[in-house]
Amino acid sequence: MLEVKTISVEDTYEIRHRILRPHQSIEQCKYKEDHAEGSFHLGVFYDGTLISIASFSPQSQPLLTEASAYRLRGMATLEGYRDQKAGSTLIKHAEHKLAESGVQAVWCNARHHVKGYYAKLGWKELGEPFDIPGIGNHIVMYKTLRTSR
């Protein structure tokens, strides 16, 4: 059974490093936004084991017109659990939480090879693809949220 919980930023580092940035040090897996006011980190647990993580921070995106936006960063799921729907469960949980607090949009710099994953969750591409040196091709993706306010 999957369970989404708020976790500490420190709980994200091992999976960030292992899945997203194995060629970098743990220190390079720490983002400046991790401790920003309003930031939060979610984890999905399967039978008590942390299998998927993501971080969210208040951050505008110049290409978005929505006044209130959060950035998704460091989304990763352990290889052996990718068919469990942990990532989509986490994203849906975060979207609901953000919408309930009045956030109008959520966005990320998606790696090019996973843009279809986000599209299946209702996210849209924005702007042109770009390269992050040492990491690869990305595209900005976003979703407008239905706020309750």
From Swiss-Prot:
Family under the similarity heading: Belongs to the acetyltransferase family.
Lineage: Bacteria, Bacillati, Bacillota, Bacilli, Bacillales
Pfam annotation, one family: Acetyltransf_1
Protein name: Uncharacterized N-acetyltransferase YitI
CDD domains, per database record: NAT_SF
Keyword Acyltransferase listed: yes
Transmembrane segments: none
Species this protein is from: Bacillus subtilis (strain 168)
MF GO annotations: N-acetyltransferase activity
This enzyme's EC code(s): 2.3.1.-
PROSITE patterns: GNAT
Domain N-acetyltransferase: 2-146
Keywords noted in UniProt: Acyltransferase, Transferase
Entry superkingdom: Bacteria
